[in-house]
Structures are given as structure tokens and as C-alpha cells.
Amino acid sequence: MSKSESLYAQAKQLIPGGVNSPVRAFTGVGGVPLFIERADGAYLFDVDGKAYIDYVGSWGPMVLGHNHPAIRQAVIEAVERGLSFGAPTEMEVKMAELVTNLVPTMDMVRMVNSGTEATMSAIRLARGFTGRDKIIKFEGCYHGHADCLLVKAGSGALTLGQPNSPGVPADFAKHTLTCTYNDLASVREAFEQYPRDIACIIVEPVAGNMNCVPPLPEFLPGLRALCDKFGALLIIDEVMTGFRVALAGAQDYYNVIPDLTCLGKIIGGGMPVGAFGGRRDVMDALAPTGPVYQAGTLSGNPIAMAAGFACLTEVAQVGIHETLTELTNLLADGLLDAAKAENIPLVVNHVGGMFGLFFTDAPTVTCYQDVMNCDVERFKRFFHLMLEEGVYLAPSAFEAGFMSVAHSKEDIQKTVDAARRCFAKL
């Protein structure tokens, strides 16, 4: 029995499912999850001593690679001054200034502790600001585990939402309308049915929780236009895409202006941080200046702020995103060539430092239904074959992959060579 197997057996007796976040349990691919001892650069090292080229990157934050020296040093120095004060610090101000400078649509920003907190708070703020209750989300998009967001689509885009997790009252979910990603007609129909009831649209500008599905050219501008027409706010969830697709996020890459933006992952440099911000008049409705309540004991804590400030300072350096895109393109092209050589039907979606692999005969993958039509069983086999080769992909056919600037061209070539051998076995 490997040490990972032993630890997993022990963990299942102490932690529900043996993990503290479900996807880590390898439920989507089968088998025993890796228990990690350390990480450095583009590599993970498990408790059994095996190294892996890592394309999960802690689910997105590690855009600079693991254990980056500038972030590590910033955390060490912050720890020496104290872990948490429950009072304002200078670093919170510096961090807010940096974020609002990097993301011009954010006039003001409020720090929280996770992406879920960011989206939950932004939706509450949108409801409070507009005086409306209903929200629109999209099938296949994930915005954290707040009750109003754990909703699946019904028989049509306008079906009142039903919860897809026990413990979420139907009365909560009924205010969530689920539309089809990349389908403006479904959104337009929702607004026409509830013209004065919808507070906001919340959307992933690149859907990264049904693998990686970029928006069609007309989709995000169309959402902006519909929000303007019907008096709703547009919330862009950049928890995954922020500072990764482009320095100012996917909103800059796709040239769309949101009312509110949610951030996470990279903003913490590996520490638990989230943030939301946007128009000054909307943010002024937030307590203590306004009536919409939001709070957090550890929000803006000095360790997380130090890590995030160091990370964003590095990410803002000239050339980072060009390198990230070049490496991702190199990987995508190499995987497509390797799959073609072995007659394996494969679509690779990618933008900036995000990518997704789809085993499908379809020419494109642009929505949730396209994703669901892909060959999940083939992905499972591919995942485990790649794991044996020392390449760690996301352990789910419905999660995006992430590149870092710590990955070398040699790492990419090793990955492509491994994939070619694995494709030959499929």
C-alpha cells in the first residue's frame, strides 16, 4: 500500500470523503487521490516521493508557479509581525490600490476570504442596490457554494430554479434563473418574462467549471446590453480568469465593462483570499457606508494581503501574460498534433493561461450540452495514464487546466511526449 493510499484510508475515517473539497477525492476519475508533500515551480511531489508536472496549480492561483520566492518572503516577513489583528492595516490599503489600478472597472474593492464569499456578497449587494430578488446564472457555470447558486436548469431556461444539493430550500432557489451559456436568446427571454425582477446576471467570462469554454464574440457584449436595457447589474466572476487571461482579466481581453467584478485565486498568491468591487455608487451601498451588510473576521488579514500584494506585483511585470499565452498555445498545439497522430478525436479550448481537453468528434465545444456529450470514460483513462507518466491534470473532465510561467518549454515537450504515448493506449 502506498503512503497516499494509507493516508486516504485514514482520512476517510476523519473527514467526509477523506477530503476538504469534493473534487480532490478523484470521484470524477476513480482511484486514490495523491497526497502532496511539497511543490516547487511547475512540479508537485507526493508523499511517496514521485514528481509530477502540475497543470492544476492549486486550481488556478499558482500562475507564477509553486513556492515563488517573492511570495514566500513576503509571507515570512508578514508572519513575523503577527498573524491577524482584526483592525485595518496599511497593507490592506496598498492591496486595494494595486487591485483597482490593475482592474480599471473597479472603483472600489472589498476583501473577503474566498471566491464563494466574493460572489455571495456581490449578489447580495446587487439585490440591495436594485431592490430586486431574481438573478440569472448559466448552466455549467460555478460561482461557489452559496445556496442561491447551487441551482440546476429545469426543463427550460425560464424554469424556476430547483436546488441541486440537499439542504438548499426551494424557496431560496426559486429566485435563480438558469440560462444557457453562449445563448443570448435564453437570456433575452428571461428578461422579457421578468423585466422588473432581475437584479443581476452573474457569469464566468470564460466558463472554467465545465472544463474551459470561452465566450462567443457576441455573448458578453450582449449580456451588457441586456443589463443596460432592463436595469440589472452585470457581475463578472473573474475568480478563475482574473490576472490569468489578461492582466486586467477576461473583461479586458473581451472588452466588456461589468458593474461588479469578483476575484479570487491569483489575488491571494496561494493564500485564501477573495474580493469584489466595481462602480463606486454600487459599492457605496455596502456597510458601513450603506445598508447592505457584509463582514468577515479574517477579511483583509495581513498574511493574505502580503502574499497577494507580492503575487500581483510580480504578475504585473511586462511579458508575463505573453509568456503564459505562448506556453499554453504550445501545449494545446502539441496535444492536438499528438492526438491526431493516434486518430484520437480531441478539441482543445484555451485562452491566456487556461485550457481544456475534450474527447469529442464535434468540431467545437461552446456550451454545457457540448461538454456533456464528450467522452468522459476516455478522459478518465487518459487522466490515469498521464498520472503514471508523471503529469498531473485536473481529476475531472469538467475542470479547466492551468499553465504557469514556471513551466518550461521542456516541461511542455515532456507533457506532449507523454500524451502521445497515452493516446496510443486509448
Swiss-Prot record:
<dbReference type="InterPro" id="IPR005814">
    <property type="entry name" value="Aminotrans_3"/>
</dbReference>
<dbReference type="InterPro" id="IPR015424">
    <property type="entry name" value="PyrdxlP-dep_Trfase"/>
</dbReference>
<keyword id="KW-0963">Cytoplasm</keyword>
<dbReference type="GO" id="GO:0042286">
    <property type="term" value="F:glutamate-1-semialdehyde 2,1-aminomutase activity"/>
</dbReference>
<comment type="similarity">
    <text>Belongs to the class-III pyridoxal-phosphate-dependent aminotransferase family. HemL subfamily.</text>
</comment>
<dbReference type="InterPro" id="IPR015422">
    <property type="entry name" value="PyrdxlP-dep_Trfase_small"/>
</dbReference>
<keyword id="KW-0413">Isomerase</keyword>
<comment type="subunit">
    <text>Homodimer.</text>
</comment>
<keyword id="KW-0663">Pyridoxal phosphate</keyword>
<dbReference type="GO" id="GO:0030170">
    <property type="term" value="F:pyridoxal phosphate binding"/>
</dbReference>
<dbReference type="Pfam" id="PF00202">
    <property type="entry name" value="Aminotran_3"/>
</dbReference>
<comment type="pathway">
    <text>Porphyrin-containing compound metabolism; protoporphyrin-IX biosynthesis; 5-aminolevulinate from L-glutamyl-tRNA(Glu): step 2/2.</text>
</comment>
<dbReference type="InterPro" id="IPR049704">
    <property type="entry name" value="Aminotrans_3_PPA_site"/>
</dbReference>
<keyword id="KW-0627">Porphyrin biosynthesis</keyword>
<dbReference type="InterPro" id="IPR004639">
    <property type="entry name" value="4pyrrol_synth_GluAld_NH2Trfase"/>
</dbReference>
<dbReference type="InterPro" id="IPR015421">
    <property type="entry name" value="PyrdxlP-dep_Trfase_major"/>
</dbReference>
<dbReference type="GO" id="GO:0008483">
    <property type="term" value="F:transaminase activity"/>
</dbReference>
<protein>
    <recommendedName>
        <fullName>Glutamate-1-semialdehyde 2,1-aminomutase</fullName>
        <ecNumber>5.4.3.8</ecNumber>
    </recommendedName>
</protein>
<dbReference type="GO" id="GO:0006782">
    <property type="term" value="P:protoporphyrinogen IX biosynthetic process"/>
</dbReference>
<feature type="modified residue" description="N6-(pyridoxal phosphate)lysine">
    <location>
        <position position="265"/>
    </location>
</feature>
<dbReference type="GO" id="GO:0005737">
    <property type="term" value="C:cytoplasm"/>
</dbReference>
